[in-house]
A protein has these predicted regions:
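Flexible, glycine-rich surface segments
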Residues: 219-306
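A short, gly/pro- and small-residue-rich
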Residues: 106-107, 166-178, 302-321
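Structural recognition of the beta-strand scaffold that forms the well-ordered cores
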Residues: 86-89, 106-110, 151-155, 174-177, ...
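Extracytoplasmic substrate-binding proteins
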Residues: 129, 150-153, 160-241, 265-266, ...
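Stable alpha-helical elements in mature extracytoplasmic
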Residues: 83, 93-97, 103, 140, ...
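Bacterial Sec-exported substrate-binding components of ABC uptake systems
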Residues: 16-95, 204-233, 316, 353, ...
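A short, structured surface patch at a secondary-structure boundary
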Residues: 52-56, 60-145, 151-156
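Bacterial Sec-dependent N-terminal signal peptides
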Residues: 1-23
């Protein structure tokens, strides 16, 4: 009897080991909104929080060309064959991720492509290899269907989108990209690992992200010895409301990691905060630095929009910085296009301006002071 029980126990342990080896989860270091699992059926990519306050989760099964699809696919949102060769993307950071992986040539469609700055993308556009597909609010479904993409990488604020339903019914897989809802700058950049399996570029993506994270964390550690934390404010007025990043937001995290005392750091808001100009003045009139003043790029612009802006110390001492330093050929702001996948440079820029002397021989790429005229 003892031998029989031992044999059963060994079989059970073996079965558990087999089951564990059949599924391997590639853990993320920072990203919260996607996961990758290697299973017996294939690579499973899960996406959650594709837009703020979403409770939905999507599961995509990625298969090799000759792999048979599972008989029961009810647990998957879509089944996709790799590697992809024809894709439609819908946001400029997605182009940057594909550029890093060397896969821009796979793009065949984009909404309002004239505003993309990436050189390889624009070269393909000039050769008519990339088609305009309307805009994100009104997609040209007929044109997308003509392109016959392997996958449509979506970006939006809800899944209530008639055009995307039409694509699904036509057999085109629609995948939601949630890099933009990540709170940590490195979390956004880590989404390069999500794109990689579609092109069998996992090793490259891991190497690229490791380098980005290493540079970011090394600079952050370098700042640990600083004894002062300059105060920082952000944002500007739009239609009588002052919009500024919440303490739990992407920019809020960058300010924190740059060892700045962001004056709204205690808020848990992950998006933007809506405030009155008077409240902002009361809280931040004496702030040392002012970042991301919306569309403003010069002091005369701020001055012409009323006297209130001039009452801030950052205005008086000319310590206001715009993210419009680097622009693309058509005027697109690279802060939005490439910044999400270059967080180490965003951090470096902020540190350069608020902690003079900490970084030597560096030219900021994204942030610059407002122009004098």
């Amino acid at each position: 009897m003892h031998k029989y029980l031992t044999f059963i126990l060994l079989l059970f342990c073996y079965a558990c080991a087999e089951n564990q080896s059949a599924t391997t989860t590639n853990s993320n270091a920072y990203a919260q909104n996607f996961s990758i699992e290697k299973t017996a059926e294939g690579t499973v990519l899960a996406v959650k929080n594709p837009w703020p306050n979403s409770t939905l989760q999507y599961r995509y099964l990625l298969l090799s060309p000759n792999t048979q699809a599972p008989k029961d696919s009810s647990s998957y949102t879509q089944i996709i064959r790799k590697p992809l060769s024809r894709i439609v993307v819908t946001a400029t950071p997605q182009v940057t991720a594909l550029e890093l992986l060397g896969q821009v040539e796979a793009i065949v469609g984009f909404p309002q492509p004239q505003f993309v700055s990436n050189a390889n993308f624009r070269n393909s556009l000039e050769q008519n290899k990339i088609a305009a597909i309307g805009n994100n609010q009104q997609l040209d479904v007929e044109r997308i269907l003509q392109l016959k993409p392997d996958v449509f990488f979506g970006f939006g604020v809800s899944d209530n989108h008639n055009a995307l339903e039409q694509l699904k019914k036509a057999g085109i897989p629609v995948l939601w990209i949630a890099d933009w809802t990540e709170r940590h700058p490195l979390g956004r950049a880590e989404w390069i690992r999500f794109f990689a399996p579609f092109f069998q570029k996992e090793n490259l993506a891991d190497s690229l992200f490791k380098t980005i994270a290493s540079e970011y964390n090394s600079l952050q550690k370098q700042l640990d010895t600083l004894k002062t934390r300059p105060t920082v404010m952000a944002g500007a007025i739009y239609q009588d409301v002052w919009y500024l990043p919440g303490g739990g937001s992407y920019l809020g995290q960058l300010f924190k990691d740059a060892k700045a005392d962001y004056l709204w750091k205690d808020t848990e808001i992950t998006g933007s905060i809506s405030s009155s100009a008077e409240q902002v003045l009361l809280k931040a009139q004496n702030a040392d630095f002012w970042f991301a003043p919306a569309h403003y790029t010069s002091y005369p612009q701020l001055k012409n929009d009323g006297n209130l802006y001039q009452r801030f110390e950052a205005f008086a001492h000319q310590k206001i910085y715009t993210y419009n330093k680097s622009l693309g050929p058509s005027g697109g702001t690279l802060f939005f296009e490439t910044g999400p996948y270059q967080p180490h440079l965003l951090l470096k820029d902020i540190v350069y301006w608020i902690h003079p002397g900490v970084i030597d021989a560096y030219t900021p790429y994204y942030f610059k002071p407002l122009d004098d005229e």
